[in-house]
Protein backbone atom coordinates (compact mmCIF):
# COMPACT_ATOMS: atom_id res chain seq x y z
CA UNK A 1 0.00 0.00 0.00
CA UNK A 2 1.43 3.35 -1.03
CA UNK A 3 2.28 5.81 1.74
CA UNK A 4 1.90 8.86 -0.49
CA UNK A 5 -0.81 11.51 -0.76
CA UNK A 6 -2.61 11.29 -4.11
CA UNK A 7 -3.19 15.07 -4.18
CA UNK A 8 0.10 16.74 -3.18
CA UNK A 9 2.47 13.74 -3.44
CA UNK A 10 3.69 14.03 0.15
CA UNK A 11 5.45 10.81 1.18
CA UNK A 12 7.63 9.35 3.91
CA UNK A 13 10.83 11.13 4.92
CA UNK A 14 13.83 9.49 6.60
CA UNK A 15 15.14 10.85 9.87
CA UNK A 16 16.58 9.80 13.21
CA UNK A 17 15.36 9.17 16.75
CA UNK A 18 17.65 10.94 19.21
CA UNK A 19 17.72 9.62 22.77
CA UNK A 20 18.60 11.55 25.91
CA UNK A 21 22.14 10.13 25.69
CA UNK A 22 22.29 11.47 22.09
CA UNK A 23 22.29 8.04 20.39
CA UNK A 24 20.81 8.13 16.90
CA UNK A 25 18.66 5.41 15.31
CA UNK A 26 17.01 5.58 11.90
CA UNK A 27 13.26 6.13 11.61
CA UNK A 28 10.63 7.23 9.12
CA UNK A 29 8.34 10.26 9.34
CA UNK A 30 5.14 9.21 7.55
CA UNK A 31 2.34 11.55 6.41
CA UNK A 32 -1.03 11.31 8.15
CA UNK A 33 -2.99 9.68 5.31
CA UNK A 34 -6.74 9.11 5.43
CA UNK A 35 -8.78 6.92 3.09
CA UNK A 36 -11.73 9.04 1.99
CA UNK A 37 -14.33 9.00 -0.78
CA UNK A 38 -13.69 11.96 -3.07
CA UNK A 39 -15.60 13.56 -5.94
CA UNK A 40 -13.09 13.90 -8.80
CA UNK A 41 -12.97 16.62 -11.49
CA UNK A 42 -15.07 14.54 -13.90
CA UNK A 43 -17.77 14.01 -11.25
CA UNK A 44 -17.07 10.38 -10.39
CA UNK A 45 -16.67 9.16 -6.82
CA UNK A 46 -13.60 7.17 -5.84
CA UNK A 47 -11.61 6.32 -2.73
CA UNK A 48 -8.30 8.15 -2.37
CA UNK A 49 -5.51 8.28 0.19
CA UNK A 50 -5.20 11.96 1.11
CA UNK A 51 -3.07 13.65 3.77
CA UNK A 52 -4.83 15.66 6.46
CA UNK A 53 -3.12 18.85 5.30
CA UNK A 54 -4.91 18.59 1.93
CA UNK A 55 -8.20 17.84 3.71
CA UNK A 56 -7.88 20.92 5.94
CA UNK A 57 -6.86 23.11 2.98
CA UNK A 58 -9.99 22.07 1.06
CA UNK A 59 -8.08 20.63 -1.89
CA UNK A 60 -10.55 17.73 -2.14
CA UNK A 61 -14.33 17.59 -2.11
CA UNK A 62 -15.67 14.80 0.08
CA UNK A 63 -18.46 12.62 -1.30
CA UNK A 64 -21.56 12.31 0.87
CA UNK A 65 -22.64 8.83 1.92
From Swiss-Prot:
<dbReference type="Pfam" id="PF00830">
    <property type="entry name" value="Ribosomal_L28"/>
</dbReference>
<dbReference type="InterPro" id="IPR001383">
    <property type="entry name" value="Ribosomal_bL28_bact-type"/>
</dbReference>
<dbReference type="InterPro" id="IPR026569">
    <property type="entry name" value="Ribosomal_bL28"/>
</dbReference>
<dbReference type="GO" id="GO:0006412">
    <property type="term" value="P:translation"/>
</dbReference>
<dbReference type="InterPro" id="IPR050096">
    <property type="entry name" value="Bacterial_rp_bL28"/>
</dbReference>
<dbReference type="GO" id="GO:0003735">
    <property type="term" value="F:structural constituent of ribosome"/>
</dbReference>
<comment type="similarity">
    <text>Belongs to the bacterial ribosomal protein bL28 family.</text>
</comment>
<dbReference type="InterPro" id="IPR034704">
    <property type="entry name" value="Ribosomal_bL28/bL31-like_sf"/>
</dbReference>
<keyword id="KW-0689">Ribosomal protein</keyword>
<dbReference type="GO" id="GO:0005840">
    <property type="term" value="C:ribosome"/>
</dbReference>
<protein>
    <recommendedName>
        <fullName>Large ribosomal subunit protein bL28</fullName>
    </recommendedName>
</protein>
<keyword id="KW-0687">Ribonucleoprotein</keyword>
<dbReference type="GO" id="GO:1990904">
    <property type="term" value="C:ribonucleoprotein complex"/>
</dbReference>
<dbReference type="InterPro" id="IPR037147">
    <property type="entry name" value="Ribosomal_bL28_sf"/>
</dbReference>
Amino acid sequence: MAKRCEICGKGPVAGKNVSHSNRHTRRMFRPNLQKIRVITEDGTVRTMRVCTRCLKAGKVQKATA
